[in-house]
Curated annotation (Swiss-Prot):
Negative results: does not block Kv11.2/KCNH6/ERG2, Kv1.1/KCNA1, Kv1.2/KCNA2, Kv1.3/KCNA3, Kv1.5/KCNA5, Kv1.6/KCNA6, Kv2.1/KCNB1, Kv3.4/KCNC4, Kv4.2/KCND2, Kv7.1/KCNQ1, Kv7.2/KCNQ2, Kv7.3/KCNQ3, Kv10.1/EAG1/KCNH1 and Kv12.3/ELK1/KCNH4. Weakly inhibits Kv1.4 KCNA4 (27%). Does not inhibit Nav1.7/SCN9A and insect DmNav1 and BgNav1. Its main location: secreted. The lineage of its organism: Eukaryota, Metazoa, Cnidaria, Anthozoa, Hexacorallia. Peptide with both antimicrobial and neurotoxin activities. This toxin acts both on ERG potassium channels and sodium channels. It potently and reversibly inhibits human Kv11.1/KCNH2/ERG1 (IC(50)=34 nM), rat Kv11.1/KCNH2/ERG1 and Kv11.3/KCNH7/ERG3 voltage-gated potassium channels in a similar potency. It acts as a gating-modifier toxin that shifts the voltage-dependence of ERG activation in the positive direction and suppresses its current amplitudes elicited by strong depolarizing pulses. This is Kappa-actitoxin-Ael2a. Has the CSbeta/beta fold, which comprises anti-parallel beta-sheets stabilized by three or four disulfide bonds. It holds the Pfam family Defensin_4. One of its GO terms (biological process) is defense response to bacterium.
């Protein structure tokens, strides 16, 4: 996936969704251009 930043935290950018995939163990997220940025990077 594409990397993105929530402040200084690196995450993975998911296009076209407002929620992170629940089976990947993400602990946080932030809104991002036309999608969401989910972290930590898996």
């Amino acid at each position: 996936g594409t990397t993105c930043y929530c402040g200084k935290t690196i995450g993975i950018y998911w296009f076209g969704t407002k929620t992170c995939p629940s089976n990947r163990g993400y602990t946080g997220s932030c809104g991002y251009f036309l999608g969401i940025c989910c972290y930590p990077v898996d």
